[in-house]
A protein has these predicted regions:
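Positively charged N-terminal leader segments that act as targeting/secretion signals
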Residues: 9, 30-41
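N-terminal polybasic/positive-inside topogenic patches
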Residues: 13-16, 21
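Internal helix-turn-beta structural module
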Residues: 351-394
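Short hydrophobic targeting helices and cationic amphipathic motifs
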Residues: 3-4, 41-42
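Active-site-facing alpha/beta catalytic cores
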Residues: 49-53, 62, 120, 133-288, ...
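N- or domain-start disorder-to-order transition segments that initiate the globular core
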Residues: 57-94
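Conserved, mostly hydrophobic/aromatic
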Residues: 106, 311, 377
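Conserved phosphate/anionic-ligand binding catalytic regions in large, soluble enzymes, centered on
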Residues: 102-115, 373
Length: 402
């Protein structure tokens, strides 16, 4: 350690002078002298220590606390009722108390809130038409897990330009969910991180944990505390065991780190979620057919779980070709019509217009068409919902006469 004069940091405060008697009184001459230079302490060893914290962080911005966003977009009585009733319906479907089919249908991801609202209004008519046979929930995905890189969703980059206005994205997401649920349409979404649920989860009727995160301990812990039913997808390679393990893990209490509505770091303790299930989404090969359903149910039995399966018509089951969702859904409908009660739900990627488009700077986007995975168009979507509703009716007849 060394002492330097005039150094700019690490200064020791000068001790206060004590006046105890005549001998300590300064003369006028002494008082006119310039003050002694202040002495500064400098830890040379510490100054030479390498920097090990935040070395790859370019910038840290403040995140608006969840409570602020919740006050801006208050959950209305109508939105709360719609969300609650759909959660209850899904609970009954999962526990074999309702023979309807849960259908999660909508765009691969939301990038245009206006198109999303138009889709929601059109879907609402079909939800009402098929209410006796289907519990239709709109797929409203704001976050996109990426295998490598790419646009990560409306919350992460709402302006689609790499500006990453996340505070804006969170507000847009909550506002859209509120608008959708207020017209009577329950919403489903994927939960990708530990913080964003505090901004939107009260408006979500059903949640998903994706294939890339099903094996993640933190996502299993999150699911154990979510207020909505949650589906776990099988792994990207088709591994079913990790999904059934996730369902078991999420059914138990957990303690983990998250944030409060006020935005403070917190320890969260959960009760466990009894409304979790597996989603067959394909992998190296599809797994939507009857043989795959049988295999999944054997895996469920090995895990001491009831076999209640949702089948994703897209992703690995469509081999990434959106038009393949139609034959996949017809195969699933045939299984249902033959009386298979183990299939409790399906997922469909659907938009106003079929296909997909690339996000190209400076190039206008086609309204109502996906910028992530390809989707089937509106007419095909409506047809598939009708066929699924007919399959549920047929299943009832088969089971009633069995």
């Amino acid at each position: 350690h060394i002492f330097l004069q005039g150094f700019t940091f690490g200064a020791f405060p000068q001790p206060a002078e004590r006046v105890t008697g005549p001998d300590t009184l300064k003369s006028t001459e002494d008082s006119n002298k310039p003050p002694e230079p202040r002495r500064f302490f400098f830890d040379l060893e510490r100054a030479m220590q390498p920097i090990t914290d935040d070395v790859r962080i370019r910038e840290i911005k403040e995140l608006t606390p969840p409570s602020h966003v919740l006050r801006e977009f208050v959950c209305s009585e109508r939105a709360a009722q719609v969300t609650y009733e759909s959660r209850q319906a899904i609970h009954r479907i999962l526990h074999d108390m309702d023979d309807r089919l849960l259908v999660i249908i909508g765009p691969c991801s939301i990038h245009d809130t206006k198109a999303a609202m138009q889709y929601a209004k059109q879907l609402m008519g079909l939800r009402e038409r098929y209410a006796q046979d289907l519990e239709i929930v709109m797929r409203v995905y704001f976050e996109k897990p990426r295998t490598t890189i790419g646009w990560k969703g409306l919350i992460n980059d709402p302006d689609l330009d790499g500006s990453f206005q996340i505070n804006k994205g969170l507000r847009l997401a909550r506002e859209l969910l509120l608008n959708i649920t207020e017209i009577g349409m329950p919403a489903g979404t994927e939960f990708l991180d530990m913080i964003s649920p505090q901004y939107i989860a009260d408006l979500v009727a059903w949640g998903a944990i994706g294939a890339r995160t099903t094996e993640s301990q933190s996502h299993r812990e999150l699911a154990s505390g979510l207020s909505c039913p949650v589906g776990f997808k099988n792994g990207t390679d088709g591994n079913l065991r990790i999904a059934f393990d996730a369902v078991k893990a999420a059914s138990h209490p957990h303690h983990f780190l998250s944030v409060t509505k006020g935005g403070h770091s917190a320890i969260v303790s959960t009760n466990g979620n009894e409304d979790c299930h597996v989603i067959l989404r394909g992998g190296k090969t599809p797994n939507y057919d009857a043989a795959s359903v049988d295999a999944a149910c054997k895996e469920a039995a090995n895990a001491a779980l009831a076999c209640r399966l949702m089948i994703d018509a897209s992703h690995g089951n469509s081999q990434k070709k959106p038009e393949n969702q139609i034959p996949v859904l017809r195969n699933i409908a045939a299984q249902i019509a033959e009386g298979d009660a183990r299939i409790m739900g399906v997922m469909i990627e659907s938009h106003l217009h079929a296909g997909r488009q690339d996000l190209v700077p400076g190039k206008p986007l086609t309204y109502g068409q996906s910028i992530t995975d390809g989707c089937i168009g509106w007419d095909d979507s409506a047809q598939m919902l009708q066929e699924l509703a007919d399959a549920v009716k047929a299943r009832r007849l088969v089971l009633e006469t069995a």
